Amino acid sequence: LKKLDGAGAASIFKAAKAKGVLTFADMTADAYGIGPEGVAEIYPYTDYIMPSYEEAVYAAREEDPDAIADYFLERGVGTCVIKMGSRGCFVKNRSQRFMSEAFAVKAVDTTGCGDAFCGAFISAVLDGMGLEECVRYASAAGAINATVLGAHTAVKSDSQVRGFMEEALKNTEER
């Protein structure tokens, strides 16, 4: 969808920001060969960017999560959330910086875990949760997604995600 890359996406994000709409961007592999700067025009209009570690390394040409986050922040992104699979999630903005651990699950299929994370993260932000809570909630959704075969059959409800989080906390306290 070349019309949504570069200037096309930037015009959509710019219009959204002008109306006061929060903007979120998940990244994907560079299927069209547009290069790391191919979507850089959206960065000044992006409140939250949520690349996987591999996507972030490609875009920033850096390997250190801190340096990667700085790359996005220096270009105008509000908050950088780097999804790192079983290693957790690195988060940075102008006032916060933290690493959030992943939930330990027996992974059956990781297809769609990043999408589950992003959807849950957006939902949590729109529900007014704090940033660390948003990340934990999103991580829980991603972890639940990994426990079944398929990209979109595991995460069914907010109460399921919250129950998973409570159970994980209980198990951690028992150790």
Cite the ranges covered by each PLM segment.
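Conserved post-catalytic alpha-helical subdomain immediately downstream of the catalytic base
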Residues: 71, 75, 79-84, 101-169
